[in-house]
């Protein structure tokens, strides 16, 4: 009995496993899998359609074709289970074994596996230390290789050509062995003593000094130690036995008309078997060497094609001239096994249809067509019908459902009640692309969708389709209801703002009823309460827009979270009172006492969610929607051609601009301005004109003059339909209105350059032919761009998801002390992102102190919600240290304290949340909104850079930060550092403005001074760079020879003479060696030193410098000794939009990157080479660092200046790798976060910083070993952080030296491929390469990430699956004995079930036998 239970259990359960390992298969292993050798290339008999014996479909090897029936028909039915037929040799069993039984082919000659040969770096090549070309020559029989030199003077592994081999034979006879082909390689591989080689390499590595050699040795050592650790043997990379795939995985399907469709693999296998058999025959016949050799080569090529067709030589083509699909093609690429069948499957119980709007639905409902529902819920209906006794069998139930009788519809209603369905719209760019709803049955064939979830789906009703899925199990329904219901997804996971917000018609309706109008009917009436207003409005006594006075009841939340009610009188518009009727208690009236634009409605809902909770918000959102639709219909707002009012001043403005352009053309003709300047000026003029026309138009459309009650004329906001639509945020924008009624303005060509002649007409007036074609010219490019953008954006999302997919919240607190500092993001005089937005929802890493009383305001580990962020703002604190994903020390995944708030839920993130994927989706989803083009800087932008002063915008106090200054005799300060900032704080002490202060700027205020708005606090000359002295003394010239290194020039206007340093190219041979400079000396002619160091005050003068002082002059601190003219930096293209984001995440090194200072110290210039300048930085302790910089690079530092480590010394885009190396992880994170946000901010997309931080954390997973210490790690090897930590912990226990590491930055593609999990990497990109590397190393995949678990078909270890896996691991940890005891116990019900199943499936006598046994 127990055995019976065990057998039935075992048939049901799949094997439990915790990890997957991939290894090379030895020939013995291949034979052990096999059920027999395939000897013939035949497939099936063309007459009987039965498989040929010993052929590719042989039933004897692979199993029967029909269940429990042998091929010749002698044994049929279940009772013969397990019998092997003596006539045809087929085992009687299930036919599905033909999916799992393998065969094999014994190869007559060994064959190299193409992956280990050709997949770079070639593993066979590395092991033998022979180049790939040479190995190919041996394999394809073009050269001999010496396998055993014996006593001769040949080298082992030396290649011999045919002639050389014959010569050697003559010379040495049989003293040596040389072979060719795979046998030779196999023999060489077999002779390698892996252990000895590893030892030898390790010793050699310690002695060698050359960089290239170390690299080469490390490569070999890696592969060899992989073989050593994994237990793979090198000779297994050469195949002697070829496994044959089970036949049902390479089927042969009869088509109508007697033809067959077959898998390409059968062709490839046939080819191998044919050649193998021919080779066997030739060997038996002792055929001539050259024929055998040719056959062996052909066999090698056939096996290559089977494993990876097209990897070497020409691909083998099928009958229809297309490449045959080999085994490698089966698994790689978009239509390979991984991406097509394992990561994405088609599912049952699903359907799709067009969507239409469902304005009467509640937020949690979706309208499901009856026809669809009937089909989707069929099994549920069948079981209900049988349960009710309306049908006795499934067949009867089916008939009832097909007839669609009334009882079926009643049961359908019952079945779908509270059974959620999932709706999905492709493309599913983020998790809100699939949400759950309760179905409501509707007539017709279209799915009805609630308008408020359109934003999340990015759906509109112009023919979009959506798919419906039915969650079947109870758990699935539970999760759908509690986690995926649309009512539970009110906030956007990317930024934590509401996403269930009204848009378009609803906004227009709400905006319309909350506007007020002068002199409307009922103006000035007074009402006792809101009900009276409603009655008055319904009886036409008061207009929607009339200003009235009403007594309202207002409930406000107090500190304790209770609602306190109070009465007050308000003067407001009647429509706002109608809206107030539906506003839940607890919201202040001020939120609706304004025209309700989209922004205002969003704010209202956000406030409601944060203060009154989810349920109230959802009900309120629905009410808002019904009201908005109602009054939008009522308002009668529509669009007519007369709504587009062209301003009267337009003609005048345009003719003025045309005059200006003519003037500039004249200047250009007379040579006063260059071509580039003319172009930029013209474009500037037209941009300005366009703005002026637009302004005139908006003034005309936005305001209308009306008479008030006294008959006076007053201005009020206009009721123009177009203005109302764009002002409310329902549809359209100022830019679009400008094209309709202003002027269309400048257009771009397809390459992005701007056409100088603008379109002066607008759409109201109509375009002429030329204008029409100008506008279509750039427009077509826009359409082409959109298509490209979608693909690019999708690929970026895929890479992001792949790199972050295994990042899950694994613990509550990792206990780290590390943190990052947050401050407001300020550029110049504008706060781009205030501190509150940056720290909201984070956890404090250090207590926050009150700057005035030094008392603790907030303790460490406080969760910063809205209320606590308000405290920070009240005390104007502008720097806090918070926990961050980058500094989290959780071993796998991340901890909830470091992550902070789950943006989509509003509380601290739960353990098990898949934050990696959420981050990837949040960054990828708005990708399609980003632009694709690179910007050319020109016109206004390029001239704005030449600023020459700092004027503060707000009144406050000055703080000088990191600013090194010297004081001049007149009392002004002069900046002598370049990374300094000037900060303006407001009266509360919050930072409002940040300004960079360039070297040599004169600063007219001191630290702590008060300034007024508009005051100029610093000035400098943007076109020259001054050399400023920091010490007082006497000036001495060095190497300044008149006529050689310098010339005197006299200014004709002023008569003043100045000294100019000549260019090195113009000097005579003797002058080339001279290095012109000035130095400062004291009274005794001894060198003076710069303050705080041993660096003499020498100032090297580059070519073109103007000297303003003469030799021997006395100078004071802060005096300008010389001026170096600055050419304004060339306009270069700025990569923007999507390509910029991709560059940042791929951590690409920019072209001509900025050169950063490697150490802190004083700058001096050494001897130049031919085309490079030499820059030397001397640290305070005397160590120096030299940097050779190409002459054409613009060096932004000067002799004698002090630079900090990581400061820019030659301009250019900064390289993230340099930032990481010199300034550390936090600076890098800050850089990437700000740069990515910059791109999204331009498009008005909000993404929380923490999502970008999560991706950066994944890019920093790996470290480089700088000193291996006593660990087994190799120098310069890239290893996961966690692995180094584990290795070091082991070493610490043994009191050894630990490995030292430095962080490295990997781009997202590299990081995905370098992940610990080979399954995840293989399913991402470069499948062959990943699998080759993994199999050689005998890699083990612990299935930690989400992707690996999806691929092996398990619950993912995130969300609800997280606890499931934890329990599984806990059970796995139990002792083996406990498990066995549990297995032995058979419950009564189990026994009964087992018995009944056994009786069902077998003949009566077997049941008798089972009873006897008992």
From Swiss-Prot:
GO terms for cellular component: DNA-directed RNA polymerase complex. One of its GO terms (molecular function) is magnesium ion binding. Residues 1392-1403 have a biased composition (Low complexity). SUPFAM superfamilies: beta and beta-prime subunits of DNA dependent RNA-polymerase. This is DNA-directed RNA polymerase subunit beta'. Binds 1 Mg(2+) ion per subunit. Transmembrane segments: none annotated. Residues 1392-1414 are annotated as: Disordered. The gene is rpoC. DNA-dependent RNA polymerase catalyzes the transcription of DNA into RNA using the four ribonucleoside triphosphates as substrates. Keywords: DNA-directed RNA polymerase, Magnesium, Metal-binding, Nucleotidyltransferase, Transcription, Transferase, Zinc. Zn(2+) 2 binds at residues 814, 888, 895, 898. InterPro entries: DNA-dir_RpoC_beta_prime (IPR045867), DNA-dir_RpoC_beta_prime_bact (IPR012754), RNA_pol_asu (IPR000722), RNA_pol_N (IPR006592), RNA_pol_Rpb1_1 (IPR007080), RNA_pol_Rpb1_3 (IPR007066), RNA_pol_Rpb1_3_sf (IPR042102), RNA_pol_Rpb1_4 (IPR007083). Its EC number is 2.7.7.6. Zn(2+) 1 binds at residues 70, 72, 85, 88. It comes from the Bacteria. SMART domains: RPOLA_N (SM00663).
